[in-house]
Amino acid sequence: MAVYDLEEQEKIEALRSWWKENSKFVLLTLAACLIAIAAVNGWRWYQRTQAAEAAEIFKTISSLSGKENLSKIQETSQRLRADYAATAYAARAALISAEESFKAGDLARARSELQWVVDESREPGLVDIARLRLAGVALDEKKPEEALQLLNAPHDAAFDGLYLELKGDVLVAQGKLNEARDAYNEALKKTEGAYRAIIEAKRDAVGE
C-alpha cells in the first residue's frame, strides 16, 4: 500500500511539475481557441445581419423603375456595393441599375455597374449575365472588338444562345454578314421555344 501511495505521489508531483512548466502555453492555446470560436460566431452573426439589412435596402431598388426613379436606383445600388458588397443583393442591384441606366442612355453608368458585377460577384451566373450586357453596351458605344472579346469569354453553356445571338449582332455591325449568319445559325442550335423566331428573323435579314 505504501508503494502504491508513493507511486501516486510521484505521478501527482510529475503532473504538478508539468503544469508549472506548460500552464502558460495551455492557457494561451485555450484562449486562442475561444477567441477563434467567438470570431467565427461573430462573423456568422455579422453576415446574417448584413444580409438582412441588404435585403431591406434591395426591396427599395427592386420596386423602382423608369427614368424618374433613376437617381434613386443608382444611389441605392451604390450604397449596396459600398456597404454590402459581400451580400448577394449588391450584384443584383447593380444589374437593375445597369439596365435602368442603359434605358435612360447613361451608358457610362451602365458600364460601371456591369463591370463591378464581372469583377466582384461570386456568382458565375450573374457574371455571365453582366458580361453579356456589357458586350451590348460596348456595341452601342461602337466598340465591336471589345464586344466580341467579352462574348468570346468562357461562360456557362446555358447562355450560349444569347452570346451567339449578340455575336451575330456585332458581326452585322462590322459588315461581316457571312460570319453573322453563321453565328445566328449556331445560336438557333442552342435556343428553344418562341425566341427562336427572333433569331431566325435576324438571320433571314442578313440574306443568303
Q: What residue spans do the PLM features occupy?
A:
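Short Lys/Arg-rich amphipathic alpha-helical segments
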Residues: 26-29, 50, 68, 101, ...
